[in-house]
Amino acid sequence: MVKLLNSTRELSINALSMLNSFGDMVAQATGLNRKLLTTDSSDATARRLLQISNAKPNATVALDGSGQYKTIKEALDAVPKKNTEPFIIFIKAGVYKEYIDIPKSMTNVVLIGEGPTKTKITGNKSVKDGPSTFHTTTVGVNGANFVAKNIGFENTAGPEKEQAVALRVSADKAIIYNCQIDGYQDTLYVHTYRQFYRDCTITGTVDFIFGNGEAVLQNCKVIVRKPAQNQSCMVTAQGRTEPIQKGAIVLQNCEIKPDTDYFSLSPPSKTYLGRPWKEYSRTIIMQSYIDKFIEPEGWAPWNITNFGRDTSYYAEYQNRGPGAALDKRITWKGFQKGFTGEAAQKFTAGVYINNDENWLQKANVPYEAGMMKV
């Protein structure tokens, strides 16, 4: 399926250079320091990308009317059909109360804000209100080669409202950079296809990073919020249904920590790294900081059953922090006790999602292909 989509989904190097240049302009305007990480600093393509300048947004959105559009939806309506180059939408600071759905036919959309806490897209739909989890999302992305930078995505439904998605990504080669993704249960839906998250903050309570995409999160802050009373928290809930599927959630050099008011509940909540949403659930946490609030077992069963215990795939490698000790971890068959550096390498961004296409290098975002120096 991926090969069939490549011809319509591949961004040109020149177009991505425009994206990089404009991204640098926004970073300078917001005071963000952008550090480039590539596999080869002498790479000729990277040098050419850095030389392109003077990119301008195709559309500007501002609540106060100072842009071409007042809503993000209006700007998206201006994206040409069968778009083959980045269509850059600059969204000025403000709280945008909109529900956004970028269709599969709308490819190469680039959303750039003025900061992850300054430009915010917010909603509050939840399954308690009637829609399915898939349709609770504040922002849903289906078009390939999507990029978001310096934006906040939010679902404010609250811990009692059950599933309520802030951002759903169902697009191949999606990049989310320096964004804040806030919610409670089911905050970030890494639904399907290849996706890369860098320098983001994701907050939530139950299963708040979930789905069956090929998702790599690098240098992200994963913050567990105060849940509802008597509610246990689960960082991940990966959804692989067959062993041949490529889906996995990979956290590399991330920080897993509690929010400031997490411990205010009495009795205190229990938090786990994840649980098997589907039978062949697969999650790898490596080179990350795990705080002491994570239960020693590390991983939890699905609703106190044996579901997925033998067929899931949970691995931890080179983690640090008081919650990273492996001596009391679960003894399920699905827990990879002898997980090696060679096995971990297969889930690095350069191997797992970038492979021979080098789409991450072409996008010129901060990116580490292999194991990181931590």
Swiss-Prot record:
* Disulphide bonds in the chain: C200-C220
SUPFAM superfamilies in alphabetical order: Pectin lyase-like (SSF51126)
Pathway(s) this gene product operates in, as recorded in its UniProt entry: Glycan metabolism; pectin degradation; 2-dehydro-3-deoxy-D-gluconate from pectin: step 1/5
What is this protein called in UniProt? Pectinesterase
Q: Where is this site: Transition state stabilizer?
A: Q185
Q: Which family does it belong to?
A: Belongs to the pectinesterase family.
- Which PROSITE patterns does the entry link to? PECTINESTERASE_1, PECTINESTERASE_2
User: What phylogenetic lineage does the species belong to?
Assistant: Eukaryota, Viridiplantae, Streptophyta, Embryophyta, Tracheophyta
Organism in which the protein naturally occurs: Petunia integrifolia
Sites where the protein binds substrate: T133, Q163, R275, W277
Top EC class, one word: hydrolase
Where are the annotated glycans? N58, N124, N230, N303
The reaction(s) annotated as catalysed by this protein in its Swiss-Prot or TrEMBL entry are: [(1->4)-alpha-D-galacturonosyl methyl ester](n) + n H2O = [(1->4)-alpha-D-galacturonosyl](n) + n methanol + n H(+)
Return the EC number.
Answer: 3.1.1.11
